[in-house]
Amino acid sequence: MYIGRFLVLGKTEEGYPFVTYRVSSRSFPNRVAKVMDDNTVAILPKELEEMFKNPYITYNCVKLVGDVAVATNGSHTDIIADKIKLGLPIRDALSYSLLTMDYEKDDYNTPRIAVVLTKDSAYMGYVTDSDVRIKKVELEAGKAYYLAVYEACNITKHQEISVTGKTAEEVTKFVMDYEKFEKPVTAATVLVKDGFKLATL
């Protein structure tokens, strides 16, 4: 099943919250998730000239703002993070940013998807060409929910998977290797455990 780029939000079996972002791609498979600094993970093309072929393939996919983690499939990562930094409540920052940026104006009207995570709360959101939704999500140990740009752009308990792994690295590998979803390219995880732990693959 091909669902394109997607987010996985949940808790490890030990009860630590996490979000993983995975790039799955048919058109631009030569990309990598790179930790840019203590607060940022970016999706970058392996060949820099590819950056000019499509405006949607290079972006920050993770931003940490204080005790808040933002993960998305595009440049709205920075917009959401900036609004939170300015003091907007998480729900409002998500709503404003998704409505302002809107879906991607490519051949597929690709949705923008987002997760905002703290130690105690989690939100998922998306905007498509026909819908926008923000929802606070209750997390349970050992369970996770996925939100994707194709075939699974919904926030529902029906999109649940069990994720194994105790560390950010193990969770990232699990999501990268998850065979149900095709065309894995790269992934990044934020795990909330004694602060934030970042991992990429």
From Swiss-Prot:
Q: What catalytic activity does the UniProt entry give for this protein?
A: IMP + H2O = 5-formamido-1-(5-phospho-D-ribosyl)imidazole-4-carboxamide
Gene Ontology MF annotations? IMP cyclohydrolase activity
Identify this protein by name: IMP cyclohydrolase
Question: Which keywords annotate this record?
Answer: Hydrolase, Purine biosynthesis
What does the sequence similarity comment in the record state about its family?
Belongs to the archaeal IMP cyclohydrolase family.
**What pathway is it annotated to?**
Purine metabolism; IMP biosynthesis via de novo pathway; IMP from 5-formamido-1-(5-phospho-D-ribosyl)imidazole-4-carboxamide: step 1/1
Name the GO terms of the biological process aspect.
Answer: 'de novo' IMP biosynthetic process
Q: Does the keyword DNA damage apply?
A: no
**Could you tell me the EC number(s) of this protein?**
3.5.4.10
InterPro entries on file: IMP_cyclohydrolase, IMP_cyclohydrolase-like, IMP_cyclohydrolase-like_sf
- Which Pfam families does the record match to this protein? IMP_cyclohyd (PF07826)
The answer to whether UniProt assigns keyword Hydrolase to this entry is yes
* Record field: transmembrane: none
